[in-house]
C-alpha cells in the first residue's frame, strides 16, 4: 500500500493544516511525518491529527518546533497513532514524546512499540480488591497509605523535597519489590530533569526506571502528549510483564496547561478561566488508564502545582476528583529539619479505613493525628506562657507529640550524601509497633533526639543505649 501523502497549506504556531487527496484523509489521532527537504539528517517532524476541517484538510498539532515549515511541504500519514518503544530496552533511557532517545546513548532497540492512545481497561479486567502498597517511608505508610493502582497527589512548594520523596519511592519499589518505575517530566524545568537523571544514576536506581521528558522548552503539543507516552510504557509492564508499576508525573498541571495552549489554536471556545472546554475529558482519558487490573497495577504519584494557591482553579479542582489521596509537604516542617517534610494533619488517604488497613493500623494512625493536633492547639499557649503553665496531662501530650514528630523523620537512601546517615526501609508492622509504643508511653524515658532520623524504634533504643554508656 502506497503512503498517503498530503501537503501543508497553513502553519499557525504549533498547529499545522495539511490537505490530502479526496477520500484519503487520515484518522483523528493518527501521526503524520513531515520531512525537511533542506536538512535530510534532521529527524522527521511528527504531527498528530486533531480535527477534520472539511475540503480535505486536517488540522494537526506539531510535537516539535514548526520553524522552517513552508506551504507545499509533504506530510505522509503513518496510518497509526504515535508509537513508542516499550519493554526492557526503555529502562535506564530518556525518551521524548515520540519515543526518540534524548540521552545521546544511541537508538532504543525495543522489540515492541505501542500507540500512546489506548482505551482504559474494561470494567471486567479491573481488580476490585483494595490493597496497600508498602513504600517503606514511615509517615506515608502509617498516615497516608498508598492504594495499589491508586493515584496520589503530591503538593508542595519549591525546595521542600518533592523530588527526593519521588526518588526514594523509585528506589524502594525497585529494591524491595523489584518493581519498575516510569517517570514523566511534563512541562517542568529541563535542569531538574537533568539533575534527576544524574541523581538516579548515582543512587543506582536508573536501570529500574524509564524516563520520558517533555519539558518547559517543548511546544505545547509535546507537553500535552508526553504523559500519555509514559503511560503507554507503564501499561506494557503492567499488561505484558504482569508487574506492579509506579508512574510519576511531574507536573500534572502542565498537562492541562499545554491542552489549554493548543485549544485556542484549534479554534475551540474557551471555558472557565480560559481553560479548554474538554478539560474534564482530557484528564479523564489519562487518569482512567491508571488502574489495577487482574494482571498487574499502575500506581501513580502526581506532583500537582496549584496556580496562585487557588484550590478552586478548574485545573487542580478537576485533578482532585481523580485522586485517592493527597500528600502535602509543609515548609514549616522542613524548617524544623524534619524530612520527609510531610504534613501529617493536612495529608489524607482514601484507604486509611479500618476495613482496608485493619483496626490496629487505623487506631494508631488516628491517635497519632490526635496527639499532633492537640500539640498544634497548645502551641500558642506555650509561645506566650511557656511549658510550665500547662497541666501535667498536656505536658505529657506535648512530650509525646514532639517524640512522634521526630520519629516521623527518616533517613533516605537517596539522600545519604546530605544526611551522612545510611537510608532505612521500614516495614509497615515495625512502623505501627514503634508509634504504638510512643503513644502507650513505653519510650517516655528516651530523649526527643533519640527519635530523630532513625528507622524503626530499635534504632532509637540503640541511640539511647549509646548515650547511657557514655
From Swiss-Prot:
GO cellular component: plasma membrane; proton-transporting ATP synthase complex
Single annotated GO MF: ATP binding
Entry superkingdom: Bacteria
Alphabetically ordered keywords of this record: ATP synthesis, ATP-binding, Cell inner membrane, Cell membrane, CF(1), Hydrogen ion transport, Ion transport, Membrane, Nucleotide-binding, Translocase, Transport
UniProt-annotated binding residues for ATP: 156-163
Top-tier EC class: translocase
Membrane topology note: Peripheral membrane protein
Cellular localization per UniProt: Cell inner membrane
Enzyme Commission (EC) number: 7.1.2.2
Description of how the protein assembles with itself and partners: F-type ATPases have 2 components, CF(1) - the catalytic core - and CF(0) - the membrane proton channel. CF(1) has five subunits: alpha(3), beta(3), gamma(1), delta(1), epsilon(1). CF(0) has three main subunits: a(1), b(2) and c(9-12). The alpha and beta chains form an alternating ring which encloses part of the gamma chain. CF(1) is attached to CF(0) by a central stalk formed by the gamma and epsilon chains, while a peripheral stalk is formed by the delta and b chains.
Protein name as it appears in the record: ATP synthase subunit beta
Organism this protein belongs to: Nitratidesulfovibrio vulgaris (strain ATCC 29579 / DSM 644 / CCUG 34227 / NCIMB 8303 / VKM B-1760 / Hildenborough)
Gene this chain is encoded by: atpD
Amino acid at each position: 500500500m502506497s503512503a498517503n501523502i498530503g501537503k501543508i497549506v497553513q502553519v499557525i504556531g504549533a498547529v499545522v493544516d495539511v490537505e490530502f487527496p479526496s477520500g484519503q484523509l487520515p484518522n483523528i489521532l493518527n501521526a503524520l511525518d513531515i520531512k525537511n527537504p533542506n536538512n535530510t539528517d534532521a529527524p522527521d517532524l511528527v504531527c498528530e491529527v486533531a480535527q477534520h476541517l472539511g475540503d480535505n484538510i486536517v488540522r494537526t498539532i506539531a510535537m516539535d518546533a514548526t520553524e522552517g515549515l513552508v506551504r507545499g511541504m509533504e506530510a505522509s500519514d503513518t496510518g497509526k497513532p504515535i508509537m513508542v518503544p516499550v519493554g526492557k530496552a526503555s529502562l535506564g533511557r530518556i525518551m521524548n514524546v515520540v519515543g526518540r532517545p534524548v540521552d545521546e546513548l544511541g537508538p532504543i532497540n525495543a522489540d515492541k512499540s505501542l500507540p500512546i492512545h489506548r482505551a482504559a481497561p474494561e470494567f471486567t479486567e479491573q481488580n476490585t480488591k483494595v490493597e496497600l502498597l508498602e513504600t517503606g517511608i514511615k509517615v506515608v505508610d502509617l498516615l497516608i497509605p498508598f492504594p495499589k493502582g491508586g493515584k496520589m497527589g503530591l503538593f508542595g512548594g519549591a525546595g521542600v523535597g518533592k523530588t527526593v520523596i519521588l526518588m526514594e519511592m523509585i528506589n524502594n519499589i525497585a529494591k524491595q519489590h523489584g518493581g519498575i518505575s516510569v517517570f514523566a517530566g511534563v512541562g517542568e524545568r529541563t535542569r531538574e530533569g537533568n539533575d534527576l537523571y544524574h541523581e538516579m544514576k548515582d543512587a543506582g536506581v536508573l536501570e529500574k526506571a524509564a524516563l520520558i521528558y517533555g519539558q518547559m522548552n517543548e511546544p505545547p503539543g509535546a507537553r500535552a502528549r508526553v504523559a500519555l507516552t509514559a503511560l503507554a510504557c507503564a501499561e506494557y509492564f503492567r499488561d505484558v510483564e504482569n508487574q506492579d508499576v509506579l508512574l510519576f508525573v511531574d507536573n500534572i498541571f502542565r498537562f492541562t496547561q499545554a491542552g489549554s495552549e493548543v485549544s485556542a489554536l484549534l479554534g475551540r471556545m474557551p471555558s472557565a478561566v480560559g481553560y479548554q472546554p474538554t478539560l474534564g475529558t482530557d484528564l479523564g482519558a489519562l487518569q482512567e488508564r491508571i488502574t489495577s487490573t487482574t494482571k498487574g497495577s499502575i500506581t501513580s504519584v502526581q506532583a500537582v502545582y496549584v496556580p496562585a494557591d487557588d484550590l478552586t482553579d478548574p485545573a487542580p479542582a478537576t485533578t482532585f476528583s481523580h485522586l485517592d489521596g493527597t500528600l502535602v509537604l509543609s515548609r514549616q516542617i522542613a524548617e524544623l529539619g524534619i524530612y520527609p517534610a510531610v504534613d501529617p494533619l493536612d495529608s489524607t488517604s482514601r484507604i486509611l479505613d479500618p476495613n482496608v488497613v485493619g483496626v490496629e493500623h487505623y487506631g494508631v494512625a488516628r491517635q497519632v493525628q490526635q496527639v499532633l493536633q492537640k500539640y498544634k492547639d497548645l502551641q500558642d499557649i506555650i509561645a506566650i506562657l511557656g511549658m510550665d503553665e500547662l497541666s501535667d496531662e498536656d505536658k505529657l501530650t506535648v512530650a509525646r507529640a514532639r517524640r512522634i514528630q521526630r520519629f516521623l523523620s527518616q533517613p533516605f537512601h537517596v539522600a545519604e550524601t546530605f544526611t551522612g546517615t545510611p537510608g532505612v526501609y521500614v516495614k509497615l508492622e515495625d512502623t505501627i509497633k514503634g508509634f504504638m509504643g510512643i503513644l502507650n508511653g513505653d519510650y517516655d524515658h528516651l530523649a526527643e533526639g533519640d527519635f530523630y532520623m532513625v528507622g524503626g524504634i530499635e534504632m532509637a533504643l540503640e541511640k539511647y543505649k549509646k548515650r547511657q554508656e557514655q
